[in-house]
């Protein structure tokens, strides 16, 4: 029975990985520029996105596996859950976590930078004339990658050794053996804890800036983007109007052929107006082609069809996401206040909370649903995808910046390969920030013990197992502060919570920054949410030719019935003959 249960948990994780592969592919193909698509960049971005999402979605697997060793209804360990069995489960999870974190680090520090420099090294003219070989590109990318890696490792070593060097100097033990002991201590787990804490802290800063803003903008953007005229109809109407426009231009030019004075004032004004209208129609034609997925990958075309199906639900979905965002906001605020007020050790250990003292809605929902796997897995998957989507929206809105300088812009169908790689690295770091936030703030009880309980009944001897079958009121949720010795035998904390607690205890600075950053996240969300409700974003004048579709789509809006008809046309790919505008235009120029 135990083997079946654990196998089903891992099967659910495998199914989630397959879903994540589709999501990662949609994200990459939807945002990258089709004309500049490079196979190496596409594969690296998809695989890196898949790895980072797989890392954060290991949390419910972690919770389900450690919780499967106990009976929450009785607060006892199951008969098969011997210490060796439990240790085996924990050890397996540790190996998977180390593998995924190492893979994320390998991708961010070596693979993605190498791919970035490989793409930058390409010289089209030199390649056409045979002056640049693949070996030269590889060597150039390799040199820059090594330089980047040396820079990162140097920062890591300085950050890791300087505090301990000061401590060793104070203790008059400044020798090489002391530093060897630091690296060998707990098989290097302290060094790994520092590396994880450093990356998690950097990721949390990005999480505050990008995800905090994106979580506020995502629902509002869905609400404000009302259903518009279908892409097939837009293409048909535009083609008809463009043909009529050019025919009228030919008539004007033909009428004035051979005339000495050229066009008269009235015809000249009309021709200039037609030329301006032609440019607008050409932009609109390009918009229709891009929106319908013309010349795009089949994944993008499929996604456009799916969007068309759910387009009528955008308003409802946006309102629902606002409710979800506000519940997350309230849950994080409650946990933050609880930790600040009731932490067992305060800033000395990163504000670890022994047990929840204030009712927290999101944590309660996940704990209750975790009793019936995989309900909690589905809810957690949706929660992670919401954070991920919010991060993407935040990056797409703000762009990739250094201080006030915009280095890259992230736009659907217009993102360069270099920008895609940079965005992927940012998302990887942000997911590490999401890891901390979900496990320690959003749902701390769920991410630590899940639905595990223990029997708080006194026994005559240490070896005797307490029985609460007749005392249900003594069955209590597992907690780090439980004083009953039986709690230590029954309660098994998740591997991730152990990792994070190890980081915050060994390196309190990381714990303080990670904790107070959650309040900064809430502040950014609140400011952007209120601002977004009352202020419409301005269009970048430098990208009018590319972004004009928003104004044009709004100008083509019609009745509600027409909007739902547009949805059906997008699904089928067929359009009606006219919408009236074409008829009037044809009649005007006939």
Curated annotation (Swiss-Prot):
Q: Which residues form the signal peptide?
A: none
GO molecular-function annotation terms?
Answer: cobalamin binding
**Annotated glycosylation sites:** 565
Cellular component annotations (GO), alphabetically ordered: vacuolar membrane
InterPro entries in the cross-refs: LMBD1_LysCbl_Transport, LMBR1-like_membr_prot
Q: Where in the cell is it found?
A: Lysosome membrane
Origin, by domain of life? Eukaryota
Q: Which residues cross the membrane?
A: 9-29, 41-61, 95-115, 145-165, 191-211, 315-335, 347-367, 378-398, 422-442, 509-529
A Pfam family assignment: LMBR1
Q: Give the principal location in a single coarse category.
A: membrane
Q: Which UniProt keywords apply?
A: Cobalamin, Cobalt, Glycoprotein, Lysosome, Membrane, Transmembrane, Transmembrane helix, Transport
Kindly list the biological process annotations in GO that this record carries.
protein localization to vacuole
Q: Which family does it belong to?
A: Belongs to the LIMR family. LMBRD1 subfamily.
Q: What does this protein do?
A: Probable lysosomal cobalamin transporter. Required to export cobalamin from lysosomes allowing its conversion to cofactors.
Which protein are we looking at?
Probable lysosomal cobalamin transporter
Organism encoding this protein: Phaeosphaeria nodorum (strain SN15 / ATCC MYA-4574 / FGSC 10173) (Glume blotch fungus)
What lineage is on file? Answer: Eukaryota, Fungi, Dikarya, Ascomycota, Pezizomycotina
């Amino acid at each position: 029975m135990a083997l079946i249960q654990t196998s089903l948990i891992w099967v659910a994780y495998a199914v989630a990985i397959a879903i994540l592969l589709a999501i990662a592919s949609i994200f990459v193909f939807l945002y990258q520029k089709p004309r500049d698509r490079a196979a190496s960049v596409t594969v690296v971005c998809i695989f890196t996105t898949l790895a980072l999402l797989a890392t954060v979605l290991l949390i419910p697997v972690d919770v389900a596996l450690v919780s499967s060793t106990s009976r929450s209804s009785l607060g006892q360990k199951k008969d098969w859950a011997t210490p060796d069995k439990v240790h085996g489960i924990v050890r397996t999870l540790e190996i998977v976590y180390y593998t995924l974190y190492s893979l994320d680090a390998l991708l961010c520090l070596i693979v993605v930078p190498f791919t970035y420099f490989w793409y930058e090294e390409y010289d089209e003219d030199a390649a056409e004339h045979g002056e640049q070989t693949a070996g030269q590109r590889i060597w150039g990318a390799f040199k820059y990658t090594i330089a980047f890696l040396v820079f990162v490792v140097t920062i890591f070593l300085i950050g890791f050794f300087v505090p301990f060097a000061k401590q060793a100097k104070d203790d008059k033990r400044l020798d090489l053996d002391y530093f060897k002991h630091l690296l060998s201590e707990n098989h290097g787990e302290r060094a790994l804890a520092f590396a994880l804490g450093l990356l998690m802290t950097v990721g949390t800063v990005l999480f505050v800036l990008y995800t905090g803003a994106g979580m506020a903008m995502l629902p509002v953007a869905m609400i404000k983007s009302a259903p518009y005229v279908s892409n097939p109809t837009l293409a048909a109407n535009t083609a008809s109007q463009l043909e009529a426009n050019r025919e009228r231009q030919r008539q004007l030019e033909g009428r004035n052929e051979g005339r000495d004075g050229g066009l008269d004032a009235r015809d000249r004004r009309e021709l200039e107006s037609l030329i301006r209208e032609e440019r607008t129609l050409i932009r609109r034609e390009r918009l229709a082609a891009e929106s319908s997925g013309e010349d795009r990958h089949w994944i993008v075309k499929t996604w456009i069809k799916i969007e068309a199906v759910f387009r009528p639900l955008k308003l409802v979905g946006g309102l629902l996401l606002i409710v979800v965002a506000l519940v997350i906001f309230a849950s994080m605020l409650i946990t933050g206040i609880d930790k600040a007020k009731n932490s067992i050790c305060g800033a000395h250990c990163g504000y670890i909370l022994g047990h929840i003292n204030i009712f927290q809605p999101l944590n309660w929902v996940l704990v209750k649903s975790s009793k019936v796997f995989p309900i909690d897995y589905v809810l957690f998957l949706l929660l992670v995808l919401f954070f991920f989507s919010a991060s993407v929206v935040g990056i797409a809105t703000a762009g990739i910046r250094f201080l006030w300088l915009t280095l890259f812009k992230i736009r659907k169908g217009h993102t360069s390969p270099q920008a895609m790689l940079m965005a992927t690295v940012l998302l990887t770091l942000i997911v590490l920030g999401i890891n901390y936030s979900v496990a320690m703030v959003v749902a701390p009880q769920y991410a630590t013990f899940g639905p595990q309980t223990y029997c708080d009944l006194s026994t005559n001897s240490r070896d005797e197992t307490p029985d609460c079958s007749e005392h249900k009121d003594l069955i209590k949720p597992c907690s780090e502060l439980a004083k009953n010795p039986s709690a230590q035998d029954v309660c098994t904390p998740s591997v991730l919570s152990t990792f994070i607690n190890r980081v915050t205890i060994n390196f309190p600075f990381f714990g303080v920054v990670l904790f107070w950053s959650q309040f900064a996240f809430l502040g950014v969300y609140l400011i952007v949410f209120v601002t977004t409700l009352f202020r419409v974003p301005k269009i970048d004048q430098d990208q009018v030719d590319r972004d004009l579709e928003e104004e044009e789509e709004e100008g083509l809006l019609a009745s509600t019935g027409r909007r739902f008809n547009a949805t059906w046309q997008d699904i089928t790919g067929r359009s009606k003959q006219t919408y009236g505008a074409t008829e009037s235009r044809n009649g005007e120029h006939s």
